[in-house]
Amino acid sequence: MKKIIPICIFLTASFTTKVFAMEGWYISPGVQIGIDSKGNLHRSAQVTLGLLIEPFTTGLTIGYKWFRKFDKSGKKSWNRYNYYDLQSHALESIIQPGIGLGLIQGDNMPLTPRFKLWGGWFFLPSYEFINMKNDDSKHYFGLFGVLPLPIGVSGI
């Protein structure tokens, strides 16, 4: 019982207190590795330019995503796609949940909508839904590494 009370206090404080009290701009480079619902690898690199106004951040993201594919002979290749997202996440929660809506495009694919969810600090588990017409895999799971860097943020 003595151990449970401090744990409950910590969890209550973590989920009900404000994490940040700042405003301003930030830039956040990030990399990701993951698998799709068929077990194929994917990776990505992105840069987000965002505006931090308590209690949310909003950012524009530009990135590249590579999907590993195998042809009929078993030879692997990496197909590259460009993506553009509008992202937002809540600052007042310790788990930092976020959502992104955007478009992805490649050589063999027109602009296609994409949807992304994530949560966490610095290393973020993520889920993406991309309805690629030329592929039956639509669900993508990954782990992001990001480094948010403040640009003229007040309150630091």
Please place each PLM-identified region on the residue numbering.
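Cleavable N-terminal export/targeting peptides
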Residues: M1-E23, G155-I156
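Short glycine/proline- and aromatic-enriched beta-strand/turn motifs that initiate or cap beta-hairpins
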Residues: F20-K72, P148
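Outer-membrane beta-barrel proteins and related beta-barrel translocases across Gram-negative bacteria
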Residues: M22-G30, R114-G120, L124-F129, G155-I156
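Residues that define the transmembrane beta-barrel architecture of outer-membrane proteins
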Residues: E23-I27, G39-V47, F56, K75-Y84, ...
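Transmembrane beta-barrel domains of outer membrane proteins
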Residues: Q32, T48-L52, D85-H89, I104, ...
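Gram-negative outer-membrane beta-barrel proteins
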Residues: I35-G39, R68-G74, Q105-M109, N131-S137, ...
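Repeated loop/turn-to-beta-strand initiation elements of outer-membrane beta-barrel proteins
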Residues: I53-I62, E92-I99, W121-Y127, L149-G155
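Outer-membrane beta-barrel "beta-signal"
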Residues: K138-I156
